Amino acid sequence: MTIANPSPSNFFQQLGRQCLKTLADLRLAIALLLLIAVFSISGTVIEQGESLSFYQQNYPEDPALFGFLSWQVILQLGLNQVYRTWWFLGLLILFGSSLTACTFNRQFPALKAARSWQFYHQPRQFKKLALSFSLPDGDINKIESLLRDRGYKIFQEGDSVYARKGLMGKVGPIIVHGAMLIILGGAIWGALTGFFAQHMIPSGETFQVSNIIEKGPLADSQIPKDWGIKVNRFWINYTENGAIDQFYSDLSVVNNQGEELDRQTISVNHPLRHRGVTFYQTNWGIAGVKVQLNNSPVLQLPMAPLQTANGGQLWGAYIPTKTDFSEGAALLVKDLQGTMIIYDQEGNLTDAVRAGSTVEINGVNITIKELVGSTGLQIKADPGIPFVYLGFGLLMVGVMMSYVSHSQVWLLSVDGDGQREIYLGGRTNRAQVAFEREILAIAEEAEVSSKTEAKVNA
């Protein structure tokens, strides 16, 4: 007696079927979805794409947040850029594979079964239906007509009739799965090909996107190289009590020859979009101050950000009154409204001035021309967003379709004891009470019609 060893092809076929069965397991899909949700929440709670010093300051080793979450753990696990890590993308791919396997293993067979014609040829077959009864002297043609009036599609084979409606209720889950696959694909594509950058640019300057904070491995083609942005002007609107109402940037898209391709004024929540790259207004600052010393040309002096003891923000500049910088004055400003404070070399308050004012310090007339604001821009490109929007649109359509009841009705006409008896039964996958009322109404209407015809014939 010999024992036949399984061939390698059979082994791999069995292994493939087992893997497919595991992937199609609903429990695996739910577990993956929960993991994706947990890590997505962590990416929302933990600031993404910040500098090393930021994480060291906000997530120290001692004491670590929750006893374990320090800056080292965040960087080692990639929690500072969750959505671009290999393990998060791997979870998305695995979840997509599970959805695909479930679609082909469960949803398509269910749709195929729903589309097939299932005729009952024996009265005993109606006993397995939760809703079934018989109509003595019933008219099968009348019942067919009543079903057709209610949107049922009729199929007939001899004395047996099969009717169905709501087939889109079986198509809905397939569309839902397909929509989720499109969303996952868009998220993965965006992570691979998108980038995120930040710039602080003074008014009048032109720049090209270069300060990349995050980018995917395939993002180089998305980063603009043949065009840049010119900041024509930056300004802030203030409320009556001096609080910031909104800040604006007048931006021009220019090519490498300086020609303007597009122009738009942006503000918070109103970005500029050009060739798949979006420029958001997110911050502001004061880049410099233009001054004139006596009759000298107008000079633009840089201003540095300063933190006050109570956490406030100021900007300061040193205005030299001698060519060797041995004497001068300090200028401090809080915002772009124009009020500036000047201190002399000893730190004494000299004057509070506005743009256009002149003050004398160390025998030098200092004329304050204007403050130069700088705009803070966030620059993002995510080619996967259109796919995500498309997926969510299809998802809503699929969910609504899934709520359509798939209802099935069987009829069988049987001759016996000198009279014709109609067996009627049906089932549905949802809205059971409404379905029962519908079938009972059809039965009552058919019965009344049969009695009326019998009286007329008599």
UniProtKB/Swiss-Prot annotation:
Residues 1-25, 106-170 are cytoplasmic. The keyword RNA-binding does not apply. InterPro entries: Cyt_c_bgen_Ccs1/CcsB/ResB, ResB-like_domain. GO terms for biological process: cytochrome complex assembly. Disruption phenotype: Bacteria lacking the N-terminus of CcsB are able to grow anaerobically but not aerobically, suggesting its function is essential for aerobic growth. In these bacteria reduced amounts of some holo-c-type cytochromes are observed (cytochrome f and cytochrome c550); unprocessed precursor apocytochrome f accumulates but is not thought to be integrated into the cytochrome b6-f complex. Holo-cytochrome c553 (also known as cytochrome c6) does not accumulate however. It is found in: Cellular thylakoid membrane. It is a multi-pass membrane protein. The chain crosses the membrane at residues 26-46, 85-105, 171-191. Coiled coil: none annotated. Keywords: Cytochrome c-type biogenesis, Membrane, Thylakoid, Transmembrane, Transmembrane helix. Residues 47-84, 192-458 are lumenal, thylakoid. GO terms for cellular component: plasma membrane-derived thylakoid membrane. Belongs to the Ccs1/CcsB family. May interact with CcsA. Required during biogenesis of c-type cytochromes (cytochrome c6 and cytochrome f) at the step of heme attachment. This is Cytochrome c biogenesis protein CcsB.
